[in-house]
């Protein structure tokens, strides 16, 4: 029994499903626009096994900090396969990254000032730069990322990347957070309008992330609108570029930066029911596990109860709650069905923003396991006290 060896709470990683998702998404876009690739969003789930698989499958690493950049390098990703986005960058690490051949998408004019110094200090090195672009897509949000394409600052950076001898202008990039399909044609058309207006077709066009992934029907039903599939995203975006570029001699590489779309259904969380009580007519089961382990709030996650041999009872509108001392730490509201102490609960669709956003709150985090056939691979050991507190002075 896995619990006997690894404890009463752990994550289960599915590396095979991750590879299937990556290839399916990539090939769906390529069927419409062949010169296409994926830059995997490390922030969504930076488990090294996933990152290594992306590199093995020919994808890029999309990082937003020097920490994530270091993850990519330790996973064996070459600098020229790393795309560094993000609003704030450590200037020393950025210099090392650019001199080594990495690609930086510049987010603001202050970052450009830093880059000018780097380029001057390294005249014999080619500095690879992209520009993060911000324009209207009709989603009701004024995005905080990138340059307003109608601003003076945008003109300044465009002039710089075109006129500086040792700077190689790589790409335009954008990122808009809303995942609904109706906003995807607008981000693609906005980019096409930009390159058409400027008369510049870069060697790469990067239209960012913000895609729904695969999920159980019970989870889909809790969203107000339709959950698009890979084909719908591809038709909404890749078709725009295929049509615009069909008569052009240059066919730039098209990139998206998905996270949830490829990793969302590739991790489960397993917890154990420890107590069941009735408080003023409401049944409450406390689990070794927390909402902070699954990072899904406001919805009931896809959940399965596995009887572990103890006595079960039938319950109605029972809440499964976490081990923390927070009233709102509820994993599942109003469960109807059988449940017993020491039963296992398995929560699906935990791949996105779960492991990476679990704080060192109340308890250290649990191990991550990959079950490959009959073999159990430890992807991340369970944390212990010293993992969290060795940086404190006692």
What do these predicted regions represent?
Residues 61-62, 129, 205, 254:
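Residue-level marker for buried hydrophobic side chains located in beta-strands
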């Amino acid at each position: 029994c896995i619990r006997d060896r690894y404890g009463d709470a752990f994550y289960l990683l599915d590396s095979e499903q991750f590879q299937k998702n990556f290839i399916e998404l990539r090939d769906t876009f390529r069927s419409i626009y062949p010169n296409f690739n994926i830059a995997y969003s490390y922030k969504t789930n930076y488990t090294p096994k996933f990152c290594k698989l992306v590199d093995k499958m020919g994808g890029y690493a999309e990082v937003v900090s020097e920490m994530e950049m270091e993850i990519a390098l330790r996973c064996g990703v070459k600098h020229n396969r790393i795309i560094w986005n993000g609003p704030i960058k450590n200037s020393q690490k950025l210099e090392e990254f650019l001199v080594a051949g990495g690609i930086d998408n510049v987010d603001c004019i202050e970052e450009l000032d830093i880059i000018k110094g780097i380029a001057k200090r390294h005249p014999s090195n080619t500095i690879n730069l992209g520009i993060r672009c911000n324009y209207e897509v009709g989603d009701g949000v004024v995005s905080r990322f990138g340059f307003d394409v109608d601003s003076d600052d945008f003109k300044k950076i465009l002039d710089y990347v075109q006129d500086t001898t040792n700077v190689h202008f790589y790409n335009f990039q954008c990122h808009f957070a809303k995942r609904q399909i109706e906003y995807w044609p607008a981000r693609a058309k906005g980019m096409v309008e930009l390159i058409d207006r400027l008369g510049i077709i870069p060697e790469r066009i990067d239209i960012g992330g913000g895609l729904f992934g695969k999920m159980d029907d019970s989870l889909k039903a809790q969203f107000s609108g339709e959950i698009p599939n890979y084909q719908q995203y591809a038709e909404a975006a890749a078709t725009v570029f295929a049509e615009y570029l069909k008569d052009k001699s240059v066919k730039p590489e098209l990139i998206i930066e998905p996270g949830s779309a490829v990793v969302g259904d590739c991790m489960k969380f397993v917890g154990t029911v420890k107590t069941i009580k009735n408080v003023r007519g409401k049944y409450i089961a406390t689990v070794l596990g927390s909402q902070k382990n699954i990072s899904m709030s406001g919805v009931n996650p896809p959940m399965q109860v596995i009887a572990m041999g103890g006595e079960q009872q039938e319950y109605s509108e029972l809440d499964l709650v976490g081990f923390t001392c927070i009233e709102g730490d509820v994993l599942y509201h109003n469960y109807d069905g059988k449940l017993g102490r020491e039963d296992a609960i398995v929560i699906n669709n935990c791949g996105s923003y779960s492991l990476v956003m679990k704080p060192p709150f109340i308890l250290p985090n649990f191990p991550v396991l990959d079950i490959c056939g009959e073999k159990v691979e430890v992807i991340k050991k369970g944390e212990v006290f010293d993992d969290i507190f060795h940086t404190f002075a006692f």
